[in-house]
Amino acid sequence: PLLNILVWLLPLMLVWTLLRTRLFKGWFGERLVRLRAHFRLDRQVYRRLHDVTLITPDGTTQIDHVFVSPFGIFVLETKHMKGWIFGGEKQAQWTQLIYKKRFAFQNPNRQNYKHLKALQAALGIGPDFVHSVIVFVGPGTFKTRMPANVTRGGGWVHYIKSFQQTVFSEAQVTAMLQTLQAGRLAPTLATRREH
C-alpha cells in the first residue's frame, strides 16, 4: 500500500514543483499570449513571429512576440508576476511587493527598448512605426498608474487594435516578415540557452 501511494505521490510532487518554477511560469505566460492572439487578432492582418532572437552589436536579444501589421510593428514583452506592481514610465526600476517583501526589477519598457532598436536596425525603419507592448500575465495587480502600453491580461489586444492608421502596405509587411525570418536565429532550446 505505501509503495502504491508513493508511485502516485512522487510524480504529483514533481509536477507540482515544475509548475512553480520561474521557467515554467514564463513559458506558460508566453503561451497565454499566443492563445489570445490566435483568437483575438486576425492572422491575415497581424502577422506574427514568436521567440525571435536577433544578433545585436553586443550579442543577441530575444523578443517574446512580434506582430507585423499594416498599422505598425508591435513588440511584446511578457511578464508573469504576482503581488502588487509599482512603477512609472520614467523610473528605471519597478517594484514587486509580495507579502511585505519588495523585489526590484527593470522597467519593462527599458528592457523592451533594446528589442525595438534591434528590430529597427534589422528592418531599416524609424521608431515611429515600432511600438512597445508590455503584457503582465498572472495574478499581479498594478498599484500605480501605468503607461498605456503596459497591460494586464488581454489589454494588449485592445492597445494594438487602437492603432488604426495604415503605415505599411501588404508588400512591405510581407517583405519585413521575410527579412525577420531570414535574420533571426533558429528558435531552438540551444539558442535560448546561449542568449
What spans do the regions from the language model cover?
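Surface-exposed interaction regions that form or flank ligand-binding interfaces
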Residues: P1-T61, V68-I73, K82-W84, Q93, ...
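Acidic/histidine-enriched active-site and ligand-binding environments that engage anionic O-linkages
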Residues: G87-G88
